[in-house]
Amino acid sequence: MNKYIYLLAVVFGLSSCNDFLELSPTNKVIETDYYKTQEDLTEALVAAYDPLKWNAYNAYSSYELVSNIMSDDAETGGSTVSDQPQLQRVNDFTNWVTPTNLPEGLWGRSYEGVNRANIVIEKCPLLPEGTMSAELRDRYVAEAHFLRVFYYFQLWRFFGYIPYYETNLGLDDITTVPQLQPDEVYAKLIEDLDNNVIGKLPKVVPANEKGRATNGAAIAMKARIVLYQNDDTKMKEIASQLKELITDPAYQYDLIPDYKVLFDDEYEWCKESVFEVNYTEIGNSNDWAGKANQGNSDIIMLGARGLKDPNNVYVEGWGFAPVTKALNDAFLPDDPRKWTTIIDHEEFRAEGGTISSDVNQYTGYSVRKYHPRAGYSSTVGTEALNYKNNYRVIRFSDILLMASEALLRSGGSVGEAQDYYARVVKRAMGDDYKVPTVSLDNIYKERRYEFAMEGIRYWDLVRTNQAKDFIKGWDDTKKYLPIPQSEIDKSDGHLVQNPHF
């Protein structure tokens, strides 16, 4: 994987600034004295990216893992029903989470990301003249706005009714920050992207900067937000913006020919990658709370228990997020994405391998895309925390399918929509495959095949009003998680608990 962000942390001493960034924002003298140089702001920007990695923060708060087990594509799994109870409950919509039993790290890691992004946005314009070029300063600020939108996007999807602020809070401010309605949060996210991000970031970055936000990532993020909101007034606009990413060669996006290699290490940041979260196997961490980790701690969670591979490709893990039979059966038998996504335990055993079935919610299937592999971790620090697998957050195939959907929903060119849809289908099934006629229903099915176990399916079901049809026990009262009770208590009652809790 690319080590840019990790190496910046080493060069500029990110670990030395972590404690400072966790100090109360009321320490104005410290803040005023600290952010004086370009290196200081580089360090602050790296710190704002860092919560993207915090999958194990406060008892497993991975955006991707939680999203997968909330969907119909995965169970929770683990060793027993008591293994990580907050994850067990988020998968069971008939005995769902409570304000004191949920993956509350989703809240904390996201707001820490917001706080760190706000520091960059506030401090960059205050640097002494001549300290930093205007071009670089503006790029840093735009990146920080992108990150703030990303973190608020997660909070909006998971919690809905959230405190929203653009300047960090002092201890006395916590009771005055507005708690916005979901529609109000949506408007803020679009406004921030339109005014402060899109058009202000580079279209491409050099190899040593992979992991930093680009204009393509910002446009894709806007499209995801608009589609999740089902804002038909903006479908034509995002169709046009996505078309720019598809047709402008300056962005350098394209599908790679072979889907089967997409999740191999050497294809991180390939021409199909729009945005990834970088991880490294060389982080010297034993921090199970997650903040100091530079490796992807989700990977060990996803591995099949008791796995022994005679080919020494895969290694065992902890058996979380077992793939459901429903997902396995949804694929056409000859769709290569099925093999890339799923390890079929019967087939694995027939080839001489071993996998334990003595696990919680055993299904007979595990995820292959992010299964732990031999050589992808190291014994520096805690080996289980140090997997280098990047998360592919946005891929070019998503650009194509979002553009196709937006065209259909805005009355745009059906021919273009068919072309974009067909590119994704044919990459998987071959040029001779008879591609179905594009429709919203076919796009939604294709999204399941293309992005299975990438943290997308659940949100697609919710936004298309299909969650109740595919997820047992789901109804509209389950759209949002409860706000953690600890946060309600800290606010002295200012925060109002979400409806239905």
Model features per residue range: what roles?
Residues 87-94, 325-395:
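Flexible, polar/acidic helix-loop-strand segments at domain edges
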Residues 17-23, 38, 74, 80, ...:
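Long, intrinsically disordered, low-complexity segments
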